[in-house]
């Protein structure tokens, strides 16, 4: 049955529905699959924590987090990213964690086509090269646009302290 804000399958008593972005309203969930989109935009860890806790009520439950980089390196997204990186580089063993991080490595030239392709595994499929290369050119020409471009299209974490001012141009 397809409802306005959910799907319901009577034969399995299963429901698929979007939930509130307010963690305080989510207590009591019994989650089999949770998809948290754009974790970098979460101001607090409340939703992440209540959803993660709700996974303990079912066998083989799964929480899938999808996000780009962001600007808040003190938030839940950067914390989760750090944990995933530690699992991937084997400095932490946690069989409950699996992750894939597409982005640039230190030393990669963010202005190159290779960087765009590396950070965007769906390049040319759902990521439109002509759009992203145009945005890249804008970010190169307008340094104040570089931080947003790098977080959204190259998965590079930037902060307000990151200097994207074109100092050679400033000094002229």
Where are each of the predicted segments found?
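Inter-Walker segment of RecA-like/P-loop motor cores
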Residues: 1-32
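Non-catalytic, compositionally simple segments
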Residues: 3, 45-172
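Residues immediately C-terminal
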Residues: 23, 41-42
């Amino acid at each position: 049955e397809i409802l306005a804000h959910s799907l319901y399958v009577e034969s399995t008593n299963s429901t698929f529905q979007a939930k509130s972005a307010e963690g305080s309203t989510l207590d009591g969930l019994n989650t089999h699959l949770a998809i948290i989109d754009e974790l970098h935009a979460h101001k607090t860890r409340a939703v992440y924590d209540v959803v993660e806790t709700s996974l303990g009520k079912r066998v083989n439950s799964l929480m899938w987090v999808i996000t780009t980089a962001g600007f808040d390196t003190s938030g839940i997204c950067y914390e989760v990213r750090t944990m995933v990186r530690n699992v991937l580089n084997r400095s932490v063993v946690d069989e409950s964690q699996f992750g894939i991080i597409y982005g640039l490595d230190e030393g990669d030239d963010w202005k190159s086509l290779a960087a765009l392709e590396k950070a965007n595994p769906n390049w040319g499929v759902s990521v439109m090269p002509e759009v992203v290369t145009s945005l890249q050119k804008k970010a190169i020409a307008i340094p104040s646009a570089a931080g947003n471009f790098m977080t959204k299209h190259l998965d590079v974490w930037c902060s307000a302290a990151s200097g994207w001012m074109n100092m050679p141009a400033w000094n002229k």
